[in-house]
Amino acid sequence: MAKIYYNDDADLSIIQNRSVAIIGYGSQGHAHALNLRDSGVDVRIGLNEGSKSRAKAEAEGLQVMSIAEAAKEADVIMILTPDQVQAQVYEESIKDNLEEGDAIFFAHGFNIRFGYIEAPQGVDVAMVAPKGPGHTVRREFEAGRGVPDLVAVEVDASGNALQLALSYAKGIGGTRAGVIETTFTEETESDLFGEQAVLCGGMSHLVQYGFEVLTEAGYQPEIAYFEVLHELKLIVDLMVEGGIAKQRWSISDTAEYGDYVSGPRVIDPSVKERMQDVLKDIQEGVFADRFMKDQASGAKEFKELRAKEEKHPIETTGRKLRSLFAWEQTDADYTEGTAAR
């Protein structure tokens, strides 16, 4: 059984007696910074010169400086820049500003697990990873609740790294919901697998194929969109509330029977075998190497794949429908998925 920590297991004064630098001010960065500030923690933001996020951070009353300055001032540095730039940011602006007794934190273990970042001796390396997007982390904190976090320690140079990480998690509201102890390896590999095989890659392509099957059979695109994409949220919400069992209990007998007899025809044992291949590529560093090499060469493959997927007919249909119905988001930037970029 996983070890789970709550409010009574964490001492907020530990992080309150440290100086924290949040490197990056995107989806997670703004939530961490604001929650820590509201928890009485000394926080500053480290950003690249000319960053578009500077004005947003300053508007919240946060102290903003260069990444190097923030790393030099602070003794806890949370790196929340995108995975593909973390190693460069670390080498250019953070590494030489670390001192014995400092700690570097991450919200995802990618760069530590695959060896792109190696901390000097005497520096704690830990992870505090909220299991939710930044706007949810902030909203739940303001409501007096929290989002579950993962916590891990890779290097415990001080002998107090876990307590420091738990204190940080308490500062952003994680211990209100529960903080699960893990390792950098477990978090990184399982997170990448979940994204690629189920949550993002698996789900996206399942939805696209479902849309194609219906429209190619002559059904209206708008009807197909509702049946294979829009209603997906209703099903996922039920799963989150009570597992697959509650989802099956909540739907009609017709739908439940169809789940049992037709689901295995689509997702058969061969899919599981291919999922195991995906996991193997992650574990052996094949995916990480491919991703980082592509990013280093200008992200050519990444951009080509993104452009191709954006042209799928379900996107055109979805944009049209979302603009017509009052129950949808009015913030077009958020609706189209660019708010955190």
Curated annotation (Swiss-Prot):
Substrate binds at S252. The keyword Zinc does not apply. GO terms for cellular component: cytosol. Keywords: Amino-acid biosynthesis, Branched-chain amino acid biosynthesis, Magnesium, Metal-binding, NADP, Oxidoreductase. The lineage of its organism: Bacteria, Bacillati, Actinomycetota, Actinomycetes, Micrococcales. Its cofactor is Mg(2+). It catalyses: (2R)-2,3-dihydroxy-3-methylbutanoate + NADP(+) = (2S)-2-acetolactate + NADPH + H(+); (2R,3R)-2,3-dihydroxy-3-methylpentanoate + NADP(+) = (S)-2-ethyl-2-hydroxy-3-oxobutanoate + NADPH + H(+). Belongs to the ketol-acid reductoisomerase family. Residues 2-182 form the KARI N-terminal Rossmann domain. NADP(+) binds at Y25, G26, S27, Q28, S51, S53, D83, Q84, V85, Q86, G134. It comes from Kocuria rhizophila (strain ATCC 9341 / DSM 348 / NBRC 103217 / DC2201). Pathway: Amino-acid biosynthesis; L-isoleucine biosynthesis; L-isoleucine from 2-oxobutanoate: step 2/4; Amino-acid biosynthesis; L-valine biosynthesis; L-valine from pyruvate: step 2/4. Mg(2+) 1 binds at D191, E195. This is Ketol-acid reductoisomerase (NADP(+)). HAMAP family: IlvC. It comes from the Bacteria. Residues 183-328 form the KARI C-terminal knotted domain. One of its GO terms (biological process) is isoleucine biosynthetic process. Its EC number is 1.1.1.86. InterPro entries: 6-PGluconate_DH-like_C_sf (IPR008927), KARI (IPR013023), KARI_C (IPR000506), KARI_N (IPR013116), KARI_prok (IPR014359), NAD(P)-bd_dom_sf (IPR036291). Binds 2 magnesium ions per subunit. PROSITE patterns: KARI_C, KARI_N. One of its GO terms (molecular function) is magnesium ion binding.
